[in-house]
């Protein structure tokens, strides 16, 4: 099966996306939108473009947002106010 948006690196994806691990198939990476306000994020996500292979399901937050810890194991993209 051909997976639409499959990628290896960020540079293969368009603006506002990164090449993140698929939620459904861990061996596949897909172009994924950056995190918007209130979405889950990972504090260790690399900036875009990242030259290596990402290990997380989420992309970094959008430029105007920060990845903020909201509970012991949860992080969300929230505005940098």
Curated annotation (Swiss-Prot):
Q: In which tissues is it expressed?
A: Expressed by the venom gland.
Gene Ontology biological-process annotations: endothelial cell proliferation
Gene Ontology cellular component annotations, sorted alphabetically? extracellular region
Q: Which Pfam families match?
A: Prokineticin (PF06607)
InterPro entries per UniProt: Prokineticin, Prokineticin_domain
Q: What is its main location?
A: secreted
Classification via SUPFAM superfamilies: Colipase-like
Q: Which UniProt keywords apply?
A: Disulfide bond, G-protein coupled receptor impairing toxin, Secreted, Toxin
Location relative to the cell = Secreted
Disulfide topology: 7-19, 13-31, 18-59, 41-67, 61-77
Which segments cross the bilayer?
none
Gene Ontology MF annotations: toxin activity
Q: What does this protein do?
A: Potent agonist for both PKR1/PROKR1 and PKR2/PROKR2. Potently contracts gastrointestinal (GI) smooth muscle.
Q: Fill in the misc note.
A: Negative results: does not inhibit Kv1.1/KCNA1, Kv1.2/KCNA2, Kv1.3/KCNA3, Kv1.4/KCNA4, Kv1.5/KCNA5, Kv2.1/KCNB1, Kv3.4/KCNC4, Kv4.2/KCND2, K2P2.1/KCNK2, Kv11/KCNH, Kv7.1/KCNQ1, Kv7.2/KCNQ2, Kv7.3/KCNQ3, Kir1.1/KCNJ1, Kir2.1/KCNJ2, Kir2.2/KCNJ12, Kir3.1/KCNJ3-Kir3.2/KCNJ6 (GIRK1,2) and Kir3.1/KCNJ3-Kir3.4/KCNJ5 (GIRK1,4).
What's the family? Belongs to the AVIT (prokineticin) family.
Name the UniProt record assigns to this protein: Toxin MIT1
In its UniProt entry, the species of origin is given as Dendroaspis polylepis polylepis
């Amino acid at each position: 099966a051909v997976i639409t948006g499959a990628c290896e690196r960020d540079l293969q994806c368009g603006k506002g996306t990164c090449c993140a691990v698929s939620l459904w198939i861990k061996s596949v990476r897909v172009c994924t939108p950056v995190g918007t306000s209130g979405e889950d994020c990972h504090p260790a996500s690399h900036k875009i473009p990242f030259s290596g292979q990402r290990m997380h399901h989420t992309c970094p937050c959008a430029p105007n947002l920060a990845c903020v810890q909201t509970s012991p194991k949860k992080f969300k993209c929230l505005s940098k106010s």
